[in-house]
């Protein structure tokens, strides 16, 4: 159906599903085997599944159509400001840009607990989100946006050096 209507369906490496780790994402993507079925790459979800985002990126590169900007730390799986965790965001984004990535970057400001997120998280959302980073969702979004701009600026400066 996706091919018939020329749309692209996306699989996200969401925690606690079969396709949460890179190896299983790759199985799903290769089994479907369609140019109309691609991957969303979410740095934090890989970290929270104890995966190495760089290894995940290397395996899934041919399938990545969309990138979620969200970071986390291995130690306790807590979401942190993008670029400050173990997601290797700047390094991997640079690689994506260098290979010609022109897709979307979606900010996921999961720095505070909000009602709709509670409904999405299978585990208790306060285990991965600490309300100490931002006072509310608007501030969390602004912080993530500014952190992403800094990451992109660093990449641009490195390219121009």
Tell where the protein language model's regions lie, with residue ranges:
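Histidine-acidic metal/acid-base catalytic patches
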Residues: 21-41, 47-161
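Aromatic-lined carbohydrate-recognition surfaces of secreted/lumenal glycan-active proteins
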Residues: 7-18, 41
